[in-house]
């Protein structure tokens, strides 16, 4: 079965057929860099990084572009409040963004274009829209003629008449129509600006992504993605700008991730329940946060709470423990035994099941359920008296490959095998010397590290719990 993708544009799942065989052009809207990112910003970074990884796993060559909005009203306001200039603030939070997403297991995009590095491209785009009659200039501002684009509203599934009822013109604006939106904003006193055919100013938000997506990926791209909150007006306006200019579809598939709620309340600044990634990863393993995000289908809302985060931590630890136990058993395993073909077939079936789930609109939640079944089967196998290196290797390979698809690490902050053996030896010596208090202390220390000891007539054996 081919990969099926839910397309916001058509509101249904469709077979994923890229424009060029085995090549995928993917554009993901990045952050406005005026502060540290919050967990709502982290979700699309994690989700679309995982989708990119899965497409690569399935053999596609993915060209992945994600932008930085490094000049806009929020940045100008932050610069004014902090007494710094816009480029300094943007640079600081771009660096912070990379630190945060790297901690969360996200790979960098192939290109991270910045608005300030593409002003000429944006100006040329606007000039062409004016030439085609889709835009007009008023006193240094340039607006897009929304009604001129007959398909306006097709992504958010709203009609122009419905939109008009909620539209209004702000004081001082000179639009022809309340639905028109800014492509270029004339600079106010003291604001950062660039020279343009319409005077000093800066780009509007929506035009930036249209211009940069076209520059780096071409007129039509395979996947355009972002948070659900960007569907309207941002992505709707991108379509209007890009398709008016080129006369071609802007993107074939539109993917949007769901919202994050905090303790069953929508995350919002007014409620003061924003959680910065910068802060939370000091308290929580970033891998746990990633695992938590992927444990829910990307289109569904997530409820963020400490109990759910703890459940994610416990679940991830169970998977890592199964992997660690397999590695521990590897050296003591033998060659193929009689029922190994049955186990190898079972492992292959679980791999295929993972692929089936991920092929169904990148269902990481069900993919993770398959990983738990893989861990369960591994634990059953390790209960056998004789285990084979080939089967252990097959289990290990699947853990490693599927964890990599999800951007997760199998490393544990734990004692090394050599450290465990050394502590067991100390405990044996303590018991010989009848120092039972020390022996019990060592057992308790190992138990706290999830190491279970079994005293047998043949000596002390251990396993990870």
From Swiss-Prot:
Q: Which cofactor does it need?
A: Zn(2+)
Provide the family line.
Belongs to the class-I aminoacyl-tRNA synthetase family.
Instruction: Name the species this protein comes from.
Output: Anoxybacillus flavithermus (strain DSM 21510 / WK1)
Q: Report the GO terms under cellular component.
A: cytosol
Name listed for the protein in its UniProt record = Cysteine--tRNA ligase
A GO BP term, please?
A: cysteinyl-tRNA aminoacylation
Record InterPro entries: Cys-tRNA-ligase (IPR015803), Cys-tRNA-synt_Ia_DALR (IPR015273), Cys-tRNA/MSH_ligase (IPR024909), CysS_C (IPR056411), Rossmann-like_a/b/a_fold (IPR014729), tRNA-synt_1_cat_dom (IPR032678), tRNAsynth_Ia_anticodon-bd (IPR009080)
Q: Where in the cell is it found?
A: Cytoplasm
Which keywords, in A-to-Z order, does the entry hold? Aminoacyl-tRNA synthetase, ATP-binding, Cytoplasm, Ligase, Metal-binding, Nucleotide-binding, Phosphoprotein, Protein biosynthesis, Zinc
| Record motif 'KMSKS' region, residues | 266-270
Return the PANTHER family for the record: CYSTEINE--TRNA LIGASE, CYTOPLASMIC (PTHR10890:SF3), CYSTEINYL-TRNA SYNTHETASE (PTHR10890)
